[in-house]
Amino acid sequence: MSVVKINIDWFDHNFGAAPQNENVACVATGKTLEEVESSIVDAIRFHLDGMKAHGQVIPKEFRGEWHPEFVLTTRAQLRYSDNFITRKALSKETEINEQQLSHYATGLKKPRLGTRQKIADGILAISRRLAFIF
């Protein structure tokens, strides 16, 4: 079974998704992360069916069984985590200014690689502490 990486980002008021392999030209949007994950998988399957029907070459990773691996941008991570934790809590955990986190969430500014990792680690650390309560 092959793994297909799918990028998910936040655009204005929706999540948007597209496969990293641009030979499968599909996009999907959704108000929630779960909705966009489901929509992009359906869109890819529909597109692959069309490619097969028209005799087009199917990219290698889509031949046979495959499953998606979703890769969220920092903007998408921040928007999704807003449902569960406050930016103030994340700011305290990461030591990144709350306003700066807002700039990253809106796309006004793009964080560097080290900062992206710091944000992801901060979300994970808060999640672990919350899970420990139960």
Report residues per predicted region.
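Short, charged, surface-exposed hinge/linker loops at domain edges
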Residues: 1-3, 42-99, 103-105, 109-116, ...
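Generic low-polarity alpha-helical segments
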Residues: 15-19, 119, 130-132
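Hydrophobic micro-packing sites on short alpha-helices
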Residues: 36, 116-120
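Generic non-transmembrane alpha-helical segments
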Residues: 93-94, 122, 126
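Short C-terminal boundary/hinge segments that cap the last helix of small helical domains
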Residues: 124-134
